[in-house]
């Protein structure tokens, strides 16, 4: 059974510059850490949650280790400067999945996300493998059953695989099937896709599902496509698979990208999403601290989370 645990206070430590000025603060001084999972107490805040699970990566024959990412990313976030928007972050702990119950873990995350959103919070989830996306996305769909939900994925992979069980490569096919079951439209856009890393069968599935696909080669000029997608939906779920970044910026993932989309381009793509007023949920997935020897990759991932919280409107 998937268990919930509050985040350790030892994770939120950093340099104290408060002697300089009242606003010389860092995230470890402004993030609120909750000892209970009680989203009803935190309306209008951002629920920071960890999904400590990499069973989907293992099933997908990837490099395990992403289950340790949530706490590694908290440590990287802790010492970053606190600016506008960061005071809204409330750490609502980790959902820890026992191997091999991926399906139970996804259901627990789904229920937690739905509860947060219904309570008036927004969710920022630290994965975990990309199996995080099914639990997170399903929770968003549940919370906004009467509205159109757009799923924006920055990823080298389409993750529309067809297998006999859930993996880190199946979340968007699962979400498409959930939309089918609920008789609602499946709005999915994937930016940063590597044609070299996706079979013709996956491209055919994306075409059949009317997925908006922007290849890694074209992301430097994709703001218009992003704007069009934002305009056509009511609510947005943003998921960032860190393997969208080039291997020299993000080596610490299950499947590093030989080409990838540089961090600055990723930030420019997500800025209008964050500022749209439609973003309800976001996550960072596939970070693997086992392959981050000096902590540099954790800081790259943390900068994305920092920026999302800062821009979120």
Swiss-Prot record:
Q: Please give the superkingdom of this protein's source.
A: Bacteria
Protein name per its UniProtKB record? Formimidoylglutamase
Q: Cofactor: bound how, per the entry note? A: Binds 2 manganese ions per subunit.
PANTHER family in the cross-refs: ARGINASE/AGMATINASE, FORMIMIDOYLGLUTAMASE
Cofactor requirement: Mn(2+)
> Listed GO molecular functions?
agmatinase activity; formimidoylglutamase activity; manganese ion binding
Described by its record, this protein's role is as follows: Catalyzes the conversion of N-formimidoyl-L-glutamate to L-glutamate and formamide.
Phylogenetic lineage: Bacteria, Pseudomonadati, Pseudomonadota, Gammaproteobacteria, Enterobacterales
Q: Which organism is it from?
A: Salmonella typhimurium (strain LT2 / SGSC1412 / ATCC 700720)
């Amino acid at each position: 059974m998937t268990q919930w645990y509050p985040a350790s206070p030892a994770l939120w430590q950093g340099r104290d510059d408060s002697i300089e000025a009242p606003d010389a603060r860092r995230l470890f001084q402004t993030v609120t850490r909750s000892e209970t999972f009680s989203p009803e107490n935190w309306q209008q805040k951002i629920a920071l949650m960890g999904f400590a699970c990499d069973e989907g990566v293992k099933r997908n024959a990837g490099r395990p280790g992403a289950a340790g990412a949530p706490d590694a990313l908290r440590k990287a976030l802790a010492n970053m400067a606190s600016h506008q928007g960061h005071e809204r972050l409330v750490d609502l702990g980790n959902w820890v999945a026992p191997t091999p119950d991926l399906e139970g873990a996804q259901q627990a995350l789904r229920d937690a996300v739905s509860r947060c959103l219904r309570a008036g919070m927004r969710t920022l989830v630290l994965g975990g493998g990309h199996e995080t996306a099914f639990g997170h996305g399903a929770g968003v769909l549940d919370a906004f059953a009467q509205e159109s939900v757009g799923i924006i994925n920055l990823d080298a992979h389409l993750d529309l695989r067809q297998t006999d069980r859930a993996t880190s490569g199946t979340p968007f096919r699962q979400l498409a099937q959930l939309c089918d079951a609920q008789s609602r439209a499946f709005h999915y856009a994937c930016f940063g896709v590597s044609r070299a890393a996706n079979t013709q069968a996956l491209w055919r599935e994306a075409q059949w599902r009317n997925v908006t696909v922007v290849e890694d080669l074209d992301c430097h000029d994709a703001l218009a496509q992003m704007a069009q997608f934002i305009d056509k939906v009511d609510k947005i779920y943003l998921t960032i698979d860190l393997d969208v970044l080039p291997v020299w910026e993000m080596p610490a993932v299950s499947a590093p990208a030989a080409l990838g989309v540089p961090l600055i381009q990723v930030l420019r793509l997500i800025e209008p999403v964050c500022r749209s007023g439609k973003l309800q949920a976001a996550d960072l997935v596939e970070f693997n601290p086992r392959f981050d020897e000096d902590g540099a990759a954790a800081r790259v991932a943390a900068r994305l989370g920092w920026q999302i919280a800062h821009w979120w409107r």
